[in-house]
């Protein structure tokens, strides 16, 4: 049984909202697109990842990420509490498993915003998930976005650009590709894929 806005009723498995995974290279605008979509449709639940990365200005623990120590992340991994986890630019990121499964069981739309490694792990453990690749309009635009952040030293940006080349080459592994030429348009397209009516 799943709880719906009108009460408790059975939800056939094929009618249940599926898990949607949004991935793409660093700097492509994943967070911006998701924030725009959720502003209009807060019913789409975005999983909050755990990370060993230090907070950026304005980021809040439990809202943007669960900021954890290396030891805490080791425990989450060892206890199987993460649906997926990956290391990127010297930091680890992971999706807490239980919260995702609970929301899917209740029939709520769930969105994960994760990197390529994480998307591959989700594909392995939950093959019914829809994997969406967010691509930049061009390589030059991606470089401009990454260098324009001004929040990271040049060596970190260089690592992100190297990783972006690998991630862009993996685009064929995804079910759908959206090109981020307009945040509003891509958010609308993503919303249709998440299937929120």
Swiss-Prot record:
Q: Where is this region: Disordered?
A: 1-28
List its EC numbers: 2.7.4.8
Gene3D superfamilies from the UniProt entry: Guanylate Kinase phosphate binding domain, P-loop containing nucleotide triphosphate hydrolases
Q: Where is the Guanylate kinase-like domain?
A: 17-195
Tell me the SMART domains matching this sequence: GuKc
Q: Name one GO cellular component term.
A: cytosol
Give the record's keywords alphabetically: ATP-binding, Cytoplasm, Kinase, Nucleotide-binding, Transferase
Ligand binding (ATP): 24-31
NCBIfam families recorded: guanyl_kin
What is its biological role? Essential for recycling GMP and indirectly, cGMP.
Protein name (database record):
Guanylate kinase
Organism listed in the record: Streptomyces avermitilis (strain ATCC 31267 / DSM 46492 / JCM 5070 / NBRC 14893 / NCIMB 12804 / NRRL 8165 / MA-4680)
Q: What gene is this protein translated from?
A: gmk
């Amino acid at each position: 049984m799943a709880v719906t806005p009108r009460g408790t009723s059975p939800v056939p498995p094929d009618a249940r909202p599926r898990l949607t995974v949004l991935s793409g290279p660093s700097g492509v605008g994943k967070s911006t697109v998701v924030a725009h979509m959720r502003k209009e449709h807060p019913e789409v639940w975005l999983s909050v990842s755990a990370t060993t990365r230090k907070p950026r200005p304005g980021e809040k623990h439990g809202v943007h990420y669960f900021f954890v120590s290396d030891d805490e992340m080791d425990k989450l991994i060892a206890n199987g509490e993460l649906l997926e986890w990956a290391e990127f630019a010297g930091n680890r990121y992971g999706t807490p498993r239980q919260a995702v499964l609970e929301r899917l069981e209740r029939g709520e739309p769930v969105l994960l915003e994760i990197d390529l490694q994480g998307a591959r792990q989700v594909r392995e453990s939950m093959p019914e998930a829809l994997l969406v690749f967010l691509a930049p309009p061009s390589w030059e635009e991606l470089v401009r976005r990454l260098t324009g952040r001004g929040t990271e030293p040049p060596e970190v940006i260089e690592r992100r650009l190297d990783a972006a080349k690998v991630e862009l080459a993996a685009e064929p592994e995804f079910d759908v590709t959206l090109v981020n030429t307009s945040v509003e348009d891509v958010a609308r397209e993503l919303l249709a894929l998440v299937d929120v009516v």
